[in-house]
């Protein structure tokens, strides 16, 4: 029987009164700050996100009904009428909440992940909907409910629709994770189509796909940062290809800041997000996971975020393993000068609030040194493992900050999910306990101001407020007054707080012709950031921004010029080409942000621009090996087909460094013509062994995706042995992970298991053991797997280096092969022991591979080997697929790429098979299963001979 909520609260209060002293409220934080427990359950439960209203109250989204498909609601607190939105308030000003009320309890709310309180409209993010509740009469109850947007993927999933905030431009910003597809149409009819190869995580996330075009003609993939007008029109992608950025935060300059979590490796990050930036989690079209694209020699962080690929933005600060959540930018003076401008990033896995002090660098931002601003632990662990119960046993590790925000009083508020684990759609805290901490300066009493929106002075005060969605209300009220408040707003340009100045710039551009004229004057301001904000603001109000872009194309700051390049991406190329060439000419050859901005502006026009770009840098009169850094870098980014011969020449030049030659080979790999393939084949024959090996890798890799239709791969493969090259590259990557001291034990374990199951990987492990380079703690892991390696030579050699675990009866393939089998007995034995997983013609199930045509794939001894050593190729932890072709072949394995022309299956031995989609009859996703060893089924030598005879003699 499910426990009623009211009874649960009674039990909760009793338990809390008995065990209050056992809950650790202590936090480690700077000496000049102090933390107080502002609120805790039962005022609310399981907080996922929060916001602040104009009264200084905290609004909370609860996720009590959290993943009921994974967490039995009978044993956890459950709200039968749906999850709730709660309002918390400190009515007596003593620094602790004393009142809570339910704003809404709604069955449409299933673990909502975001809330924005914007006046009397409360936006709630809960895939597939972005909902808006309107409290028209101010009684803290919704009078209406509207689906503001719908079509987001990720129902009841962490990688889904996240929170919304109001930007300084008057628009709304929000983001979503990679649990697509996201098929969203705004109120003007513009449609976003975004997806990727990622499925799973919940029972609802079953279908997804990459390489979809939105109405702007662009391919957006994975997680997204989005902007929309308050009326629901003007949906625009601000960044894409995230894994699962939990919250994208916009500051008063219009900068976007985001954190993103990893694929259970040490690759979480925090970064500045340039408009339109590609964060690099999937391949550019979303049809491949990062693991499929990892190259030999790349570390996990580089590969995880595709850092060596043209078209991908810099990844920012590598924070290690973890579960990053909410973000905030402190624009308040209340905490003191040291904290002004601090970017705060909540890290639920690591029990910490990270902080940064970003500064402009070149044309972008250096996010600065990461510090552990607030934590429940004295020391941080970058190799944290989310489901390590032993490590999470101590309740000081149950501090799980799900969100961080700045209140109207200037204090930092931290929502604490509070649970032994975070991740994997799990929770272990059955009572739904949650907390909110308030961080303030010592010896300073911060008070929430009374904001009067009926007067200009009150509206200015609201605009200055540190609570992001509160200042939006001041913005809107002042904007409605038009140019008559221009002078009042201009007074903020003299503020000692730079964020107040920036807010004034944005608002001025909206205050009629007078305000716009004053904003244009700011394009000549001595401060680079003010000039850039003025340009950003004018982009949104000027019908024709090209004349202003032309003026700023000679700005002394690369930061401003990069803003201009960013704007050109959305403008008619025929009108902006001269500006674009001027911007390209000023590229310094080093600045990656600038390079990516001009690369995006050149999108679709690289071939046309190639001759003129060469001329700009003198490349038209030089040999390719003489190209300067600027030209070489730009051609790496643009990789036009016209540059193939030059790129090939640079890749083999003895006058260039390995780094320069590698860059040219990489650029060549991102062109897609038959000439590209031929050039890469030629590189496999060059005298530089490093480049030759890279070229072999690129051919093996590109065969399955961009170059699939550009060559007769059977001929190329026979000449170069592409399959071996591909597998060798994969095993090299895994070996690098095992030898990387930064990786967690679990990460090494998964990779060493994969190597031990693979013929090439097994040989590598034996060599590593011989060299004493294999970590000793991995010996038991290898021993449990390697004796089932598909390569007989590996299995035989393994006994010289590893201890073979005890097993049942030992079968001899050679001896069984000599036994005369009976097909009729084999038929009976198959029905009894095998048909529950395997199908032969119309007999059996489709859980394992279809064995109808198995005799065409295996000789007798090979088939015996597969039956006797059933675990030889099963990769643990992934969902398998069964692919059937028109020829009758069956491929059982794991889908790593899903393109329009071909798919790639990694089979149970780790081999990758490229299959043309036109030859596929069916593709079925399989449940994880393990085929039992013959001895566990009580099978004898004669039984095995009978089964093999039946399978090989079947017509």
Where are these regions (language model features)?
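Short flexible coil/turn linkers enriched for glycine and charged/polar residues
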Residues: 264, 498, 513, 745, ...
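C-type cytochrome heme c attachment motif
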Residues: 435, 507, 828-842, 849-853, ...
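Inter-heme linker and motif-flanking segments adjacent to c-type heme-binding CXXCH motifs
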Residues: 155, 421-422, 529-533, 540-541, ...
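Long, ordered, helix-rich scaffold segments
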Residues: 432, 439-829, 847, 854-856, ...
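Sequence context surrounding c-type heme c attachment/ligation sites in exported
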Residues: 408, 415, 821-835, 842-866, ...
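Beta-propeller domains with acidic blade repeats across secreted/periplasmic ectodomains
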Residues: 19-458, 477-480, 842, 918, ...
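C-terminal capping alpha-helices of c-type cytochrome domains
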Residues: 38, 120-121, 412, 504, ...
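Bacterial Sec-dependent N-terminal signal peptides
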Residues: 1-22
């Amino acid at each position: 029987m499910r426990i009623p909520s009211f009874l649960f609260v009674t039990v909760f209060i009793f338990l809390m009164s008995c065990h209050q002293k056992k809950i650790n409220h202590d936090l480690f934080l700077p000496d000049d700050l102090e933390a107080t427990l502002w609120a805790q359950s039962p005022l609310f439960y399981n907080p996922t996100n929060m916001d602040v209203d104009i009264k200084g109250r905290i609004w909370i989204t609860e996720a009590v009904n959290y993943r009921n498909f994974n967490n039995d609601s009978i044993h956890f607190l459950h709200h039968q009428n749906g999850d709730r939105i709660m309002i918390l308030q400190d009515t007596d000003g003593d620094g602790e909440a004393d009142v809570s009320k339910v704003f809404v309890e709604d069955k449409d709310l299933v673990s909502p992940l975001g809330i924005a309180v914007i006046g009397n409209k409360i936006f709630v993010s809960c895939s597939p909907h972005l909902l808006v509740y309107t409290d028209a009469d101010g009684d803290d109850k919704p009078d209406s409910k509207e689906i503001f947007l719908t079509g987001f993927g990720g129902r009841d999933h962490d990688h889904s629709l996240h929170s919304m905030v109001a930007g300084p431009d008057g628009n709304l910003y929000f983001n979503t994770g990679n649990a697509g597809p996201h098929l969203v149409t705004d109120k003007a009819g513009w449609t976003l189509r975004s997806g990727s190869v990622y499925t799973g995580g919940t029972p609802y996330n079953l279908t997804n796909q990459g390489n979809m075009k939105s109405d702007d003609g662009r391919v957006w993939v994975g997680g997204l940062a989005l902007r929309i007008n308050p009326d629901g029109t003007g949906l625009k992608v601000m960044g894409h290809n995230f894994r699962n950025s939990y919250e994208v935060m916009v500051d008063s300059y219009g900068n976007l800041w985001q954190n993103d979590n990893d694929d259970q490796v040490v690759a979480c990050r925090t970064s500045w997000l340039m408009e339109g930036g590609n964060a690099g989690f999937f391949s550019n079209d979303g049809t491949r996971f990062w693991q499929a694209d990892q190259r030999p020699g790349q570390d996990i962080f580089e590969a995880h975020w595709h850092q060596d690929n043209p078209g991908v933005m810099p990844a920012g600060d590598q924070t290690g393993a973890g579960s990053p959540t909410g973000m905030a930018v402190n624009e308040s003076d209340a905490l003191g000068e040291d904290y002004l401008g601090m970017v705060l990033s909540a890290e639920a896995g690591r029990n910490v609030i990270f902080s940064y002090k970003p500064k402009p660098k070149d044309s972008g931002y250096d996010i600065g040194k990461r510090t552990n601003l607030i934590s429940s632990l004295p020391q941080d662990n970058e190799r944290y493992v989310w489901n390590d119960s032993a490590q999470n046993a101590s309740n000081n590790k149950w501090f799980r900050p799900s969100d961080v925000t700045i209140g109207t009083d200037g204090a930092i508020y931290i929502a604490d999910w509070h649970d032994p684990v975070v991740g994997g759609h799990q929770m272990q805290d059955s009572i739904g306990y949650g907390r909110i901490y308030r961080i303030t300066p010592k010896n300073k009493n911060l008070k929430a101001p009374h904001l009067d929106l009926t007067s200009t002075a009150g509206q200015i005060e609201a605009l200055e407020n540190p609570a992001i969605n509160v200042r939006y209300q001041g913005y809107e009220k002042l904007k409605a007054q038009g140019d008559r408040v221009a002078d009042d707003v201009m007074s903020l340009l003299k503020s000692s707080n730079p964020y107040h100045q920036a807010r004034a710039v944005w608002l001025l551009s909206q205050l009629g012709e007078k305000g716009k004229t004053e904003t244009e004057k700011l394009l000549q301001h001595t401060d680079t950031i003010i000039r850039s904000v003025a340009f950003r603001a004018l982009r949104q109000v000027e019908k024709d921004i090209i004349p202003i872009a032309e003026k700023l194309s000679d700005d002394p700051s690369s930061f401003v010029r990069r803003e201009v390049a960013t704007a050109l991406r959305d403008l008619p190329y025929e009108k902006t080409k001269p500006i674009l060439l001027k911007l390209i000419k000023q590229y310094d050859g080093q600045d990656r942000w600038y390079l990516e901005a001009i690369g995006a502006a050149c999108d679709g026009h690289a071939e046309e621009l190639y001759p003129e770009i060469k001329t700009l840098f003198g490349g038209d009169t030089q040999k390719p090996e003489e190209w300067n850094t600027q030209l070489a870098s730009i051609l790496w980014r643009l990789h036009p087909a016209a540059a193939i011969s030059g790129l090939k020449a640079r890749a083999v030049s003895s006058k260039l460094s390995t780094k320069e030659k590698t860059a040219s080979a990489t650029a060549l790999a991102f062109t897609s013509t038959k000439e590209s393939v031929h050039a890469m084949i030629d590189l496999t024959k060059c005298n530089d062994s490093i480049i030759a090996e890279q070229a072999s890798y690129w051919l093996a890799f590109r065969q399955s995706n961009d170059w699939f239709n550009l060559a007769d791969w059977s001929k190329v493969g026979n000449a170069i042995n592409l399959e071996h090259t591909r597998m060798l590259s994969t095993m090299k990557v895994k070996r690098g992970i095992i030898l990387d001291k930064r990786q967690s034990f679990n990460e090494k374990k998964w990779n060493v298991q994969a190597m031990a199951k693979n013929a090439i990987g097994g040989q590598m492990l034996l060599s590593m053991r011989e060299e004493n380079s294999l970590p000793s703690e991995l010996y038991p892991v290898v021993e449990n797997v390697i004796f089932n390696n598909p390569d007989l030579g590996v299995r035989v050699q393994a006994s010289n280096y590893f201890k073979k675990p005890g097993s049942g009866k030992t079968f001899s393939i050679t001896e069984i092969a000599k036994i005369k089998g009976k097909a009729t007995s084999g038929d009976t034995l198959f029905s009894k022991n095998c048909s529950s997983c395997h199908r032969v013609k119309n007999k059996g199930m489709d859980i394992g591979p279809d064995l109808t045509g198995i005799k065409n794939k295996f000789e007798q001894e090979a088939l015996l080997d597969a039956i006797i050593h059933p675990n030889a190729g099963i990769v643990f932890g992934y969902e398998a697929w069964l692919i059937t072709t028109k020829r009758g072949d069956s491929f059982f394995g794991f889908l790593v790429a899903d393109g329009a022309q071909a798919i790639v299956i990694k089979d149970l031995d780790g081999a990758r098979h490229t299959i043309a989609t036109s030859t596929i009859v069916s593709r079925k996703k399989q449940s994880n299963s393990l085929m039992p060893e013959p001895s566990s089924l009580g099978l004898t030598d004669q039984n095995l001979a009978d089964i093999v005879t039946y399978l090989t003699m079947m017509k």
